[in-house]
Every structure is written in C-alpha cells, then in structure tokens.
Amino acid sequence: MTTIVRAHDVARTEHAHAAEVLRPEVAAMRALLGELSAEEWLMATDCPRWNVRDIVAHVLGNAEAALAPDLMVLRAREGALRYPRLYRLDALNEMAVDAWRDRQAGELAAEFAPLWRQVIRALPGMTEAVRGQTFDTGYPGTLPVAMGYVVDVVLARDMWMHRVDICRATGRAFVTHEHDRGVVEQVLRDLDDAWTGPPLVLELTGVVSGGWQIGADAPVATVRGDAVGVLRMFSGRVEPQPDLVVEHGDSAVLGAFRDARVPF
C-alpha cells in the first residue's frame, strides 16, 4: 500500500544543503554531455528556439548568474531591448545563450564542470542580501522570485528538466539517480503551496514513484501519471500531454491539474 505524504509537508531545501542537492545533478548532466556526439548537439529540443547546444549554453548562463547576480541584471536589461516581444525571463535566457553563441560544443562541455564547481563552492557563502534580491520574470500573474529560492531550489530542478530535454531530443534513456526524488518532491511542494483546485492524491510512477496529497482537505480523486511526464507538464512543456489516469473520484480535477504550473 502506498503511503500518502502531504506535499506541503515536504521539507524545503535549506540553503546550507543546497550545494549537496545540486552536486549530483551537475554530475549527472556532465556525464550526459560527455556522451553526446557532434550531431546530437545540434538536435532540436522541446524548448522553443533551442537545440541541445542552446540548452547547454542556457545552463552555463544559469551558473554565471548564480556567481554574478549583477550580470543577470545586466542581461535582463539588455534582453528587454534585444528581445522586446519576450517575457523578461525568456529574454534573459536568450541573452545567456547568445553569450555562448561563438563557442564550439566541445568548449561548452569543457566549461560545464569547472563553472558549476565554482557555483557549488560559492553557494554556502552567498550573503542574505544577495539571496533576498528579487527578479520579476514578467510572466503574467506571477510574483517576483527571490534569488535565494532560485539558487536553493530552482537551479537543480531546471538542470534536471533540461537533462530530460536532452534525452528526449537525442533518444537517450533518462538515467535515474538517488537525488531525483528530492527534485520531484520540491516541485510537488511548490505545486501544493500554490494549489487552489480540488484536493487530490497524486500517484507518480516511473523514475520516482509514490503518493502525495495536493490540497488540505479530503481528496476528491486520485490521479496517476508518469513522474517525468507530469513534471514536464508543470514546467509548461505541454506536448506530448502526459497520460493521466483518474484512479477513482471526480475526473473534473484533471482540468485544474493540467493547467497547474511550477517555476523551473
């Protein structure tokens, strides 16, 4: 019998442990990049406008922003001018990709490990003043996000999801690791904290399995789906739609569930 955990009760990643959470994901991504052929670096991904190489450039840009928040501010300002039709965060991400545009794929792969090692070493010493800085993504209906939340929680899940993107683009199997559960549970906590739909039980299968209650009151339904597919949906990657099954209860919960989004 599956033990049901209230997602809200999952402990938030503490700043003191953020580097420990990030380290295994960096290792997993590094291993994947080391296996890619020249052709695979050019393959299109589920991220609009980006191929595999662009995703890696974006991830390197995340490392640069974590090490130098002022650079993030500068790129956001310049991105608003260069990409005026994009949301602020999307424009920032494009600026990071542009910054690595002239580098070869092999150079990106070589820079990945040392740059992220710097981030892992620097995280414990990040000051509260920097952690308290906020960034407006520009997405409708969303609040500014704190830098502390980004480095403690989002960096690991964003890289995890982009590892999924690369595997899907290249047809490679997504290699599972012990830290996957922690990444998934932080997403579900954020989902629960912002949830306004009917309470439900979410049963995940695949790379991470288990049961989590979303919402405070008695669940009206149990929804089952593949962990990777469900997290892709929460990130806004809506195609292909995950195969969701209402095990019992009110199937109307699927509407709110499919519309839910979590920051990545």
Where are these regions (language model features)?
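C-terminal interaction segments
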Residues: 219-264
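Globin-like tetrapyrrole-binding proteins
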Residues: 131
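Glycine/small-residue-rich hydrophobic helix-like segments
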Residues: 193-233
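Short, contiguous alpha-helical
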Residues: 43-86, 136-196, 230
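An N-terminal domain-cap segment
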Residues: 5-57, 66
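Amphipathic, well-ordered alpha-helical segments in soluble domains
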Residues: 25-32, 62, 115, 158
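Short, helix-capping/interhelical loops that line the mouth of catalytic, cofactor-
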Residues: 1-17, 65-124, 134
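Hydrophobic packing residues in well-ordered alpha-helices of helical domains and bundles
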Residues: 19-22, 109-112, 152-155, 159
